[in-house]
Amino acid sequence: MTDSLTLLRPDDWHIHLRDGTALETTVPHAAASFARAIIMPNLVPPVTNAEEALAYRARIEAQIPAETPFEPLMVLYLTNNTTPETIAAAKAAGVVACKLYPAGATTNSASGVTDIQHIYPALEEMERQGVLLLLHGEVTDSAIDIFDREAVFIERTLRKVVADFPKLKIVLEHITTQQAAEFVAQAPDNVAATITAHHLLYNRNHMLAGGIRPHYYCLPILKRQTHQQALVAAATSGSPKFFLGTDSAPHAKSRKEAACGCAGSYTAFAAIELYAEAFEDAGALDRLEGFASHFGPDFYGLPRNSDTITLRREPWSVPDTLTFGDESLVPVKAGETLNWRVQK
């Protein structure tokens, strides 16, 4: 049994940092272990153009701790009104990707796309410009069961987009089902997926059996154990199509522990440690570096990081709460023990 693991410094290819005073917590947490992060644009109002992306990046950069190299990679939020000109301007400003949220699919997605045909001209420009398409892969049809919405999205929307845009790099984010893992594995090389730590560690029993545990509630929702096992198999397979994206999504404790609680699990405080636990449980610690540090930059066409981090087996207790602006935040594994810790 190994007690130490050194990795090329990883990146987070999907994170929510929020805005305002929340950045005082989320940015240092992300920057502690990751060199780069793909920053989700679902603010209120959302980040829909180059000017807003640059302003948001500046607010993030203002919270990066001194002597800490961390690069926020900015993303535009696609709407029915996103134009090819908007895409071209974003590319020129350094934006690397655009995010498709089906309207109403998740937190702050009301401005999202109602019909993907509306954004085909924007997708064509993204394909030309080399801007990636990031997908929240769920339908929002109220007639579709919440546990089936990812699988239906693949059949109803994703297959056609992949066929229509063969040169567009597409990331199906935070996959949660066996169907998604199988689709991505069999798709052309321009299609990849991110997988969260919490979807590797948990299934819907953790959220629902013996009482409702709101801090496991996220979207796409945790699925049954067979899907969790398929995700673990994909993440630990060594396939370059699957890489790290935490989807760390903070909400104040009062907004989670409520009659109508918000969706999102907070993992950025110890993300790589949580992944290490999942990979160790699967007997695949030797596959963690590829998943966390190699395959994401390779897919994005960016260089791998050159520095390293070291994880040590050092059990520690996760705090019950963390500071979150003027409120508190309950992290994943609050009050429990994590067995790995990044050496400072």
UniProtKB/Swiss-Prot annotation:
Keywords: Hydrolase, Metal-binding, Pyrimidine biosynthesis, Zinc. Zn(2+) 2 binds at K99, H136, H174. GO terms for cellular component: cytosol. CDD domains: DHOase. Coiled coil: none annotated. The active site is at D247. It is an enzyme of class 3 (hydrolase). Zn(2+) 1 binds at H14, H16, K99, D247. The modification N6-carboxylysine is found at K99. Substrate binds at H16, L17, R18, N42, H136, L219, H251, A263. One of its GO terms (molecular function) is dihydroorotase activity. Binds 2 Zn(2+) ions per subunit. Gene3D superfamilies: Metal-dependent hydrolases. One of its GO terms (biological process) is 'de novo' UMP biosynthetic process. It catalyses: (S)-dihydroorotate + H2O = N-carbamoyl-L-aspartate + H(+). Pfam families: Amidohydro_1. SUPFAM superfamilies: Metallo-dependent hydrolases. Pathway: Pyrimidine metabolism; UMP biosynthesis via de novo pathway; (S)-dihydroorotate from bicarbonate: step 3/3. Its cofactor is Zn(2+). Its EC number is 3.5.2.3. Catalyzes the reversible cyclization of carbamoyl aspartate to dihydroorotate. Belongs to the metallo-dependent hydrolases superfamily. DHOase family. Class II DHOase subfamily. Homodimer. This is Dihydroorotase. It comes from Teredinibacter turnerae (strain ATCC 39867 / T7901).
